[in-house]
Amino acid sequence: MSNTTSSIITIGREYGSSGRQIGQEVAKYFGIKCYDKELLEHAANDSGICKELFEHHDEKPTNSFLYSLVMDTYSFGYSSAGFNDMPMNHKIFLAQFDAIKKLAGEGPCVMVGRCADYALSDWPDCFSIFVHADLDVRIRRIASKYGKSDREAKDLINKTDKSRASYYNYYTNKKWGSAKDYNLCIDSGKLGLDNAAKVIIDAVQIFDASKKK
């Protein structure tokens, strides 16, 4: 099969599952860009909100303020009074939402996290993936990568996953990591990073071929 793709590939991931690294390998194979924290920079540039605020609120859970009001205000754009009065975490989410759609409109790419699968749920070219791994595998990876004890690594994993799940569940009204909400779920602990990337590449190529029928 060709090593090109016409798809936008979104990757949700458990912390320590190496979803970002796998996404980078997939992007490298197809010769397309991989956006992870780069999404924050694009959103900051487009919205005029400083990048540090995006980093502070990145995939952090929110509270108060009804989701429906956020999305109602979204339809009026950044210049509306409603947007100006909105809490900063909601401004951040909507700016990222727009940046994701804008980058997807520029062509095939890989997007990691930040509810990209939800932002592009109505795009026929979007292929959504969730990468997970057993907790003990992730503990070893994080402990080795950051020089932490197993207990410290476990605490960081639990904290980060809880934050990502709360953020995703709040803004999408779906359940983070639920298999039925993704086109493909893959265990990077069982397969290893290289094989996980290969499985994703094969799946995307099959998806691309199905669109031509």
Task: Indicate where each model-derived feature is located.
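RNA pseudouridine synthases
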Residues: 103, 115-122, 141
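Conserved phosphate-donor/acceptor-positioning beta-strand/loop module used by diverse small-molecule
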Residues: 122-145, 150-158
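Pre-Walker A (Motif I) flank of P-loop NTPase domains
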Residues: 4-13, 107
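NTP-dependent small-molecule kinase module
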Residues: 97-101, 170-213
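ATP-dependent small-molecule kinase phosphotransfer cores
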Residues: 44-108
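Small-molecule kinase domains that catalyze NTP-dependent phosphoryl transfer to phosphate-bearing small molecules
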Residues: 59-70, 74, 149-193
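Short beta-strand-centered segment that lines the nucleotide-binding/catalytic pocket of NTP-utilizing
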Residues: 33-44
